[in-house]
């Protein structure tokens, strides 16, 4: 898959040229990515058409722990947890899911952990905030600005429901002063991700995909399947979104596991997102499949 270009450092460029001559370009891309900063690491992989592998940041709160009144407690994310993830050489990115309950302290904690890890190739951090419709445009705008200010490498806007809402989502990054990586700005450093997760948005996917100024187009297959009424319909919708992301030259992300990661790679997904105890094994399978 051919994607828009990216600014390479002199060292990364030299390494890529040498590797190409030796017919080992995949290894060169990996090496360039691991010597870059977190956001540049993910951008360089995707600019080269190389799949990237990541995980949901795990909730560290002990299972069954509740508040004194018996109510459910929010997820817990710590700097120590972020530092531990940063030491995992398999990870290209982390996906911090704050869709259910936005928490600026969680963003700050994971960023602190990544910064304190001492790792030269710490993964990129993508933060998923709540949908625009849930708390309103101004709340969403403020969260994008805040997450980026705290050090996130990108922000994910879920449940984008129309072309108008897609343009609104992109405007949040402009208001943050973010240098967004996109087909019109291949030298950008921040990732802006839009997710299509309902039937209405799927019907408008072509116009949503054509929205300028964002980095990644993805489909929330679970949410879309529920909205459409079946897993089969959700899968068909996911493939339609993938086709449009490829048409406009953007990477597409999907959840995967050890059983389907090779299939998803063959289909053309460039962002593979794992979870749970089997995440590392699934990533090993995926990396082997693409020669990483």
Task: Map each language-model feature to its residues.
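Bacterial N-terminal signal peptides that target proteins for export
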Residues: 1-10
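Residue-level signal for mature regions of secreted extracellular proteins and peptides
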Residues: 14-15
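Expand to "…catalyze enediolate/carbanion chemistry for C-C bond making/breaking, isomerization
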Residues: 28-292
């Amino acid at each position: 898959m051919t994607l828009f270009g990216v600014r390479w450092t002199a060292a990364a460029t030299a390494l890529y040229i040498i590797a190409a001559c030796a017919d080992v370009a995949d290894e060169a891309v990996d090496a360039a990515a691991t010597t870059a900063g977190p956001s540049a690491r993910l951008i360089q992989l995707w600019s080269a058409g190389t799949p990237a592998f990541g995980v949901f940041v795990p909730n560290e709160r002990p299972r069954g722990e509740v508040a004194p009144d018996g109510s459910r407690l929010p997820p817990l994310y710590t700097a120590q947890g972020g530092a531990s993830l940063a030491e995992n050489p398999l990870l290209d990115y982390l996906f911090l899911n704050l869709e259910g309950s936005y928490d600026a302290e969680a963003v700050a904690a994971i960023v602190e952990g990544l910064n304190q890890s001492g790792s030269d190739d710490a993964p990129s951090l993508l933060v998923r905030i709540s949908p625009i419709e849930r708390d309103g445009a101004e709340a969403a705008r403020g969260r994008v600005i805040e997450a980026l200010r705290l050090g996130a490498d990108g922000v994910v806007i879920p449940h984008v429901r129309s072309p108008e809402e897609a343009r609104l989502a992109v405007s949040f990054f402009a208001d943050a002063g973010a240098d967004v990586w996109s087909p019109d700005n291949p030298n950008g450093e921040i990732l802006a991700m839009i997710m299509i997760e309902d039937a209405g948005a799927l019907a408008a996917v072509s116009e949503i995909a054509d929205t300028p100024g964002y980095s990644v187009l993805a489909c929330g297959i679970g949410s879309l399947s529920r909205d459409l009424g079946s897993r089969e319909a959700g899968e068909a919708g996911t493939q339609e979104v993938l086709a449009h992301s490829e048409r406009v030259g953007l990477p597409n992300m999907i959840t995967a596991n050890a059983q389907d990661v090779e299939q998803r790679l063959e289909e053309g997904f460039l962002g593979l997102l794992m979870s749970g105890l089997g995440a590392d094994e699934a990533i090993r399978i995926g990396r082997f499949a693409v020669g990483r």
